């Protein structure tokens, strides 16, 4: 249980789960603790994410602190171009350099982090706690058994329109063309956002095979997005929501293996 001097820090990722987790943290601790809600601006998210953030500020009754990277212009493509890779076994550099680095500079010792893990993600929380017994985290959605669909419904019941990406059928409000997506997801991005899809193709042309995200299931060879064949289009493909904290949790898990 956090002491009264502890800061409770919620990371708002412009997704429904982090919105509800933040609202619940305010309900649980807003009267007794310093609850901070932070967001990392990313230029590659849909512009409607900013509308959603403003609506949630009204719902929360307080402003959200927006952190913004300046080294890469908060742009994932700039990260990939300058770091010369798109993803490796430790994850994607965009989330590390555009989100985690900002949080590292902002956080204070003793902060308690609010994880937006949903009830479907109990195993991720268990793994994190097992491997980080000295790190204080709160998971209000799991504590209340709330799943992803519950969170969306709660946001709508609060009179807030879900982010445009959800309304198109996507599973989250990550960047348009999130590099954690699979083939079906990228077929959907190719249809809905051809310009952003072409930007990633162009990057892969520049960086070469090391930047390719997908493998041929038969030959096991990597192939570029430009060579993505026809097949199922999956807007609702499950992709982890991109947040500072989930990324920290996953990175810590990989580092300890
Ligand atoms: S949403 Fe995807 S592409 Fe955007 S920063 Fe996170 S991991 Fe990178």
Question: What is each of the regions a protein language model found here?
Answer:
Residues 1-257:
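Nucleotide-activated chemistry modules centered on ATP-dependent adenylation/adenylyltransferase
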